[in-house]
């Protein structure tokens, strides 16, 4: 788990008392440390209302018990209970996951609640001078004994077998009963690759629940239960694509396409098995494959660097990729018994999937990777829609669905770019780095176009999960936010509904510090939406050609 800097409390416990003048002038008092001493036998219930406390000194008293209410002090980083008469600890102490130091020296403790294993941020655990059982002492006295003991307790903590509550289906629009349309469902899911699921990153999760053999069952159960027509997955390990995902989904009537990150090209056969990438699966009953493409961002960065050091040193060094499939829609359009105009033409659908760079310090890289990907998709669509002797078709001529782990929040330049059709070439996410000369290569105007201060893409996209329908798609201890998205071209597609969030009250009641969790197999929540595809050419009704829907 990434460790924030922790400064232990000053042992001198220096304090100042405000003067009458400071009080009169409205100066606010601030105290987040408290010491209680004097051979105290019991604690006032009002203590547990001081939820702002970060440090609590309760040593050298005559306390024989600590009530479960200790869990209310959720900001505590330091708790000293040394030299008391404690014979047991409340299991609820394990919910104070902010703790960095827990001192229990010189008490009467024989056993410890396994719930202490949840204190994954602890850096100091004092247990000396307690008549603890030999199995606890044996672990504790080993090299790195504190960590081994906490891991042992977490791994052996019983987990309630209760089922996850069902996520609600949120209906946003009824299916069009007049105009012809085809409904289809799309899933987007970052499954958390095995090599990234480490105790260092996810210290709050038992090791057995991080193990891929355990997690893959929950992941496949979720994919199967969603039963989507199109499935976009990120962080799919190469070997798992061929041994798990593709065989299991092929049995259920899917075909698929997968590409690993670019680094796989320079690895041995054994090493490349563990490289992750992006996969798209589609139900063959509804779609057939026309084209498939892999977009390697580092190659595009190198080809379009235009002398920009930032492009070479920051963008080209990241080996993220995107994939796309051009599909032919099998299902006939229907609505009030009508067939679409130009029904002899194939109805195509572009589906794309990408996983952008993760580091928050590289907002410029995420934005440029997104621009490169969308620019490539625009070229693919225009080429697929072109006809001999006809002008270059509009990029919106083929319906388009984009699934991605963008590693970017809704207020980012990445989401602004996709939603609004472009961003300013001096957007703050570029970090004032010198990209201007190469960014025009990815804009609608092209390299030789007239500069207008914006980088645009020409698509008309909308997010399926608008209006904060999901409070977060990634849920870890250190970060909770929306970084996964499904976008669709609003010229041809409507969203009918989406799968809503997991009940936040359940998360709270079960003290879910972060995911993965024994009941939740990834650190991401899947997205699922039902979309409605309308044909680009609408039929004639009573001699009148219906106008465009937008």
Curated annotation (Swiss-Prot):
Give, as one word, the top-level EC class. hydrolase
Its annotated function is as follows: Poly(A) nuclease with 3'-5' RNase activity. Catalytic component of the CCR4-NOT complex which is one of the major cellular mRNA deadenylases and is linked to various cellular processes including bulk mRNA degradation, miRNA-mediated repression, translational repression during translational initiation and general transcription regulation. Additional complex functions may be a consequence of its influence on mRNA expression.
What residue spans carry the region label Required for interaction with cnot1, cnot3 and cnot7? 1-148
| Alphabetic keyword roster | Cytoplasm, Exonuclease, Hydrolase, Leucine-rich repeat, Magnesium, Metal-binding, mRNA processing, Nuclease, Nucleus, Repeat, RNA-mediated gene silencing, Transcription, Transcription regulation, Translation regulation
Q: Which positions does the entry assign to LRR repeats?
A: 52-73, 75-96, 98-120, 121-143
Where found, per UniProt? Cytoplasm; Nucleus
Q: Where, by residue number, does Mg(2+) 1 bind?
A: 235
SMART domains per the record? LRR_TYP
Q: Which PANTHER family match?
A: CARBON CATABOLITE REPRESSOR PROTEIN 4 (PTHR12121), CCR4-NOT TRANSCRIPTION COMPLEX SUBUNIT 6-LIKE (PTHR12121:SF35)
According to its UniProt record, which cofactors does this protein need?
Mg(2+)
Organism equals Xenopus laevis
Q: Which reaction does it catalyse?
A: Exonucleolytic cleavage of poly(A) to 5'-AMP
Q: Which is one Gene Ontology cellular component term of this protein?
A: CCR4-NOT complex
Give the family this protein belongs to, as stated in its UniProt record: Belongs to the CCR4/nocturin family.
Q: Which GO terms describe its biological process?
A: mRNA processing; regulation of translation; regulatory ncRNA-mediated gene silencing
Listed InterPro entries: CCR4/nocturin_mRNA_transcr, Deadenylase_CCR4b, Endo/exonu/phosph_ase_sf, Endo/exonuclease/phosphatase, Leu-rich_rpt, Leu-rich_rpt_typical-subtyp, LRR_dom_sf
Q: What is this protein called?
A: CCR4-NOT transcription complex subunit 6-like-B
